[in-house]
């Protein structure tokens, strides 16, 4: 017989999506620690559903890349962008991401003139809902694009040298 449109199967709201809208983000997610890959996918997709088109700009980072960032504003020019030395950043273990909102100007990062700062608060709140610790809550150097795996804050897994021993 005849099937009415209401009889057709509708996708369930609990359907798990395995990728995001953005191929650059998807490639970076694959390099993250397996423990947070789906969390990041869910966060990015939920943000998009709420009108925030986010791209992961940084995920897993080598100690050398971390040293280059740590040097900014210290031994090289520019402003300080991190307080994390190599080995002490959650990025070094694939447990953190930095995001940018892709807007009409292709890459407004919340630091540019004219950006609605309240959007970062909304994005930060959303990240926390997905189980991340938000860099916007850092006490010393606010890092609104930064999100890291929250459970590690509770587990106190840093060794005496500050490294995240569990993920070395």
Please place each PLM-identified region on the residue numbering.
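Acidic helix-start/capping segments at beta-turn-to-alpha-helix junctions
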Residues: 55-71
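Short aromatic/hydrophobic-glycine micro-motifs
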Residues: 2, 52, 74, 131-135
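Cytochrome P450 catalytic domain signature, combining two hallmark sequence patches
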Residues: 73-85
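Active-site acidic/histidine clusters and adjacent loop/turn architecture
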Residues: 16-58
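Solvent-exposed, polar/charged alpha-helical surfaces in well-ordered, non-transmembrane soluble domains
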Residues: 38-41, 45, 67, 121, ...
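Low-complexity, glycine/serine/proline-rich disordered segments
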Residues: 1-22
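Short, charged/polar surface micro-motifs in flexible loops or helix N-caps
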Residues: 63-66, 75, 104-106
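Catalytic cores and adjacent binding grooves of peptidoglycan-active enzymes
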Residues: 84-168
């Amino acid at each position: 017989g005849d099937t009415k449109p209401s009889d057709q199967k509708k996708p369930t709201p609990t359907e798990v999506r395995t990728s995001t809208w953005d191929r650059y983000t998807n490639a970076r997610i694959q390099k993250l620690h397996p423990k947070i890959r789906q969390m990041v996918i869910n966060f990015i997709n939920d943000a998009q559903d709420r009108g925030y088109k986010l791209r992961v700009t940084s995920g897993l980072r080598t100690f050398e890349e971390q040293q280059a960032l740590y040097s900014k504003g210290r031994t090289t020019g520019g402003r300080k962008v991190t307080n994390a030395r190599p080995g002490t950043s959650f990025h070094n273990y694939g447990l953190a991401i930095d995001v940018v909102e892709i807007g009409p100007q292709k890459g407004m990062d919340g630091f540019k003139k004219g950006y609605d700062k309240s959007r970062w608060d909304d994005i930060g709140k959303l990240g926390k809902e997905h189980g991340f610790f938000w860099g916007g809550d850092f006490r010393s150097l606010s890092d609104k694009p930064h999100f890291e795996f929250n459970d590690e804050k509770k587990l106190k897994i840093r060794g005496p040298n500050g490294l995240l021993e569990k993920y070395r």
